[in-house]
Amino acid sequence: MDSVIESEEGLKVDSPNRADAETSNSKIHEEDEKELKTESDLKEEKKKTEKNKQEEDEKTKTVPFHKLFAFADSFDIILMILGTIGAVGNGLGFPIMTILFGDVIDVFGQNQNSSDVSDKIAKVALKFVYLGLGTLVAALLQVSGWMISGERQAGRIRSLYLQTILRQDIAFFDVETNTGEVVGRMSGDTVLIQDAMGEKVGKAIQLVSTFIGGFVIAFTEGWLLTLVMVSSIPLLVMSGAALAIVISKMASRGQTSYAKAAVVVEQTVGSIRTVASFTGEKQAISNYNKHLVSAYRAGVFEGASTGLGLGTLNIVIFCTYALAVWYGGKMILEKGYTGGQVLIIIFAVLTGSMSLGQASPCLSAFAAGQAAAYKMFEAIKRKPEIDASDTTGKVLDDIRGDIELNNVNFSYPARPEEQIFRGFSLSISSGSTVALVGQSGSGKSTVVSLIERFYDPQSGEVRIDGINLKEFQLKWIRSKIGLVSQEPVLFTSSIKENIAYGKENATVEEIRKATELANASKFIDKLPQGLDTMVGEHGTQLSGGQKQRIAVARAILKDPRILLLDEATSALDAESERIVQEALDRIMVNRTTVVVAHRLSTVRNADMIAVIHQGKIVEKGSHSELLRDPEGAYSQLIRLQEDTKQTEDSTDEQKLSMESMKRSSLRKSSLSRSLSKRSSSFSMFGFPAGIDTNNEAIPEKDIKVSTPIKEKKVSFFRVAALNKPEIPMLILGSIAAVLNGVILPIFGILISSVIKAFFKPPEQLKSDTRFWAIIFMLLGVASMVVFPAQTIFFSIAGCKLVQRIRSMCFEKVVRMEVGWFDETENSSGAIGARLSADAATVRGLVGDALAQTVQNLASVTAGLVIAFVASWQLAFIVLAMLPLIGLNGYIYMKFMVGFSADAKRMYEEASQVANDAVGSIRTVASFCAEEKVMKMYKKKCEGPMRTGIRQGIVSGIGFGVSFFVLFSSYAASFYAGARLVDDGKTTFDSVFRVFFALTMAAVAISQSSSLSPDSSKASNAAASIFAVIDRESKIDPSDESGRVLDNVKGDIELRHISFKYPSRPDVQIFQDLCLSIRAGKTIALVGESGSGKSTVIALLQRFYDPDSGQITLDGVEIKTLQLKWLRQQTGLVSQEPVLFNETIRANIAYGKGGDATETEIVSAAELSNAHGFISGLQQGYDTMVGERGVQLSGGQKQRVAIARAIVKDPKVLLLDEATSALDAESERVVQDALDRVMVNRTTVVVAHRLSTIKNADVIAVVKNGVIVEKGKHETLINIKDGVYASLVQLHLSAST
């Protein structure tokens, strides 16, 4: 093996003069690089500081409030105007009531000795009823108007955000965002924005109009007393403002730390097979919990500051009262005010200023909404440099398809310091086929990305038909270019819809025709739902070959002038490859075709082959021309491929390898890849999700069955039990809440005593008012202590609960068996939404709701006791009214519960659409599918939108009726009181004592019913979370029970295995499969695509359990072994390795649960031939690999993945197509690494390249779910008409 050339160093040749040339060149290069490096280092540092600064800013930046409504249409504006009118009217209800109230007091106070009090009161009572009717209408308008317009605008913001995200250039996704963040913003942040522009605005307007109304009335009744009371207003305003500022700062900080946790969820769930295989559950959990801690801190701090602010507000209010009572007494004596007038002024100022106090939840909602809107609106405003929605630019009748890259300099935006092309030029004449070959990372795929205009070169130009690509209308030119890439990205919808992405409004006929051309119609017709079969998230329900043919059909439907094939067949087995290649050959006719490949067989027939090396074209010509120069780069590539194989399969091998090479580099650039990678994350095995059958995906009807859509009701105690550790906090908080609750009724007693004092003789009036004033001040001090205590204790408990629920739920998710993630409702998008939004809502069920409930109970009890002591007859009469008020609150709660449930689930579906599209942004861009995605998204949002509107109307009715009932019961109580006074059953001060004690209790109740939307949302959220927490994982990696063998030999046996994937119970994968693998030997599984090869690997790792039969390791059934230990004995290397967005070091250490020593990491990297290229990177082992590893080439990723598998020193090695995606040189290096690590380990290889399989100790041929042949290569090849022999034939014919 002397000839192994380290792939990263380039093709070095032994001829002396070449070597000299290289050394001198390399010297020059080194100097260039030095200069570049110092510049780039400076830039890096600058970039870092800028980035930190940006992050700091982001924490606190907000949008001006009026900007939240930037996206309203005319109907919204009408709704908001109506809502505003309603809110103003509703807000004036209370100030007007104070006038009626003063009348009542004067009637009672001035007629203490006459007997016709009830007639005079009857007149006033009637006015109360009219006022009730007015507020009913106003409240209805207010709530419905604002709720509906808020729902509509939030929907529009979601769509606009998605739309702008979809039109961004690819660089934006490489550098600035990732799928987790986008979905998080769409599901979490829009809720906050909607909150800030919906009913909360109505409420704020209502409160402001109460404030203004109150003061206008007070000044008209008596300006002097009002002025004295107003002197305290600045204090109120200042404490209120300080409060709002602190809250908004904290809210945005909490969001930032939670967004980081969301990324952990997306990465883990998206790559669950890798996590399971490397028993990385603990690591993911601790990573997640780290981010939760900072979110918890921010939450508690927010609670504490709110409490202090509100406490301050309260003491100011009570001192104002004290002042008013004392000074009001003076006014009666000196200025001849009546008692009623003084009370109108006190009440009017009081309701006015209290209304400001109640505005704090609105303020905090506005602040949170403004902070959330900042990032979203920034994104919506961002103008991409390459804008898919830009309609300017040239549109020709058609293009010929001449492509020219002229003197192009390019580096990826995510890695500006690495120059990919320096002065690269290439021209391709129309109708010809050009193949690009070269090592992994040489820039082949970059050419494809530039032709698609995913990126623009930094200098130089890309021209089509002689016109600079930038001059064309982007959408139009992309519609002329068809891309088929190595890992095709399919969307979570039906096969038909996936193909239809190729062409707007394609007919079923056209789609059928495209499937026939792509050789896909056969397998599609076999599926129970045919074209309507769902493909699963990222197409996981189909095998690799099937997905690729659908992708080809999609490209055919588009009928492009220019066809870009990026490793289109490298990931397929011989049979599928031949079929797909045939389909491609048919459609390549008369089109300009650019093929990136590393299997030379694919490129042989190209009109021109260009060999790219380190971003330059080193040779070009046809296959035969290039072979004439035996020292040329192309000849070397071929020789490399042939070195290790016998000619018979060399070509095919070559073919692959080159292809794959190409692929990899493409990948580098490509998020698409990264995207598509995602799919493979799901499908860690060569075939997606290990589901490689030729059969169909989950039939729709099954999905319905599998999701119990009706989530069980969760009892309040169940959630409360989770808060157990905080019981001391909750008890202290509850004590504070009880005290807080009693303050209002006591306040009622004070008022009635003051009323009585106002009608006493002058001397007594003077001393009484002074006494009560002091009592008011004491009450204020009490409130100042009790209020902050309540909020602090409850927010500690609440934030701990949210943290605990998120953590528990995530822990549970990570422990689910892999099959659970195959279900659509458990996709990474849906789980992310559950963890972020639902966990936060549950808090409303315990902490906050509990505080409110305890406080209300205390108010009610205190109120009742006071009332019954004062006058039991009147107390009964007033009490009879209270159930009406209570009933109204209850009806309102019920309505709210019915609605919020379905809306939540429907938005989850919509967020899945977004997740898919952003995850597959390259595919969306190349098929100009932005509008299509938007249509799908909007369609999914229609249902929740209608629900939201219904909710608005019903809430409005409930809200309005409650006011009407309230005012009518006032009228009734006063009239009843007047009759009792007439009859001498009670005195006038007792009437007021009963009245105030009970109304203050009622105020407490109505405040709690305002919580209802939150509590109903919370119980639905709790149900969705407990559905996860309660589900027992069928195969639980955290289960410590089970045997652990002291010494593993590595004998594996599968006996009579039958198996179906849980997500597709009607497709039998294995029927009675038997296979035994001896310790230390290598067994290769071969068979057609979809025969079940990768399924064997999934079963050996216990991702799934067989339906019947057993699998044993060293004679022990694996179900009886401890799962975590079992998985630590197996090392998996799959075709598309999933790397996490961490450093290379962290990715390798992941194999050992993150605690590998530096020496272990380096030696694993050396064994896997990765140490060389890693040391060559600027940051070495500390290089970040990017989301899904996009910053490394295919060969590099694969070697890191092998190092990761080796670091755990497994007894059993599972290689699932480990080298199929690599070019010749990388493959050689990787294969060499694999040969080293396979020694003394039991190895199971799934492969379709013969060279990889030939030397296996046993080859097993899988067909129709059983093993049909097994033996050594030499034996099997000689079976006449044997399955293996015919597969080999296929291979050879495919490769010639």
Swiss-Prot record:
Biased composition (Basic and acidic residues): 9-59, 640-662
Residue positions binding ATP 2: G1087, E1088, S1089, G1090, S1091, G1092, K1093, S1094
Membrane topology: Multi-pass membrane protein
Positions carrying Phosphoserine: S657, S660
Transmembrane region(s): 77-97, 128-148, 205-225, 227-247, 307-327, 336-356, 731-751, 774-794, 865-885, 952-972, 986-1006
SUPFAM superfamilies: ABC transporter transmembrane region, P-loop containing nucleoside triphosphate hydrolases
GO CC, one annotated term: plant-type vacuole
Residues noted as binding ATP 1 in the record, renumbered to the chain: G438, Q439, S440, G441, S442, G443, K444, S445
CDD domains linked: ABC_6TM_Pgp_ABCB1_D1_like, ABC_6TM_Pgp_ABCB1_D2_like, ABC_MTABC3_MDL1_MDL2
Keyword terms, alphabetized: ATP-binding, Glycoprotein, Membrane, Nucleotide-binding, Phosphoprotein, Repeat, Transmembrane, Transmembrane helix, Transport
Database matches in SMART domains: AAA
Listed GO biological process terms: auxin export across the plasma membrane; auxin import into cell
Residues annotated as domain ABC transmembrane type-1: 80-368, 730-1017
Full protein name: ABC transporter B family member 21
UniProt organism field: Arabidopsis thaliana (Mouse-ear cress)
Gene from which this protein is expressed: ABCB21
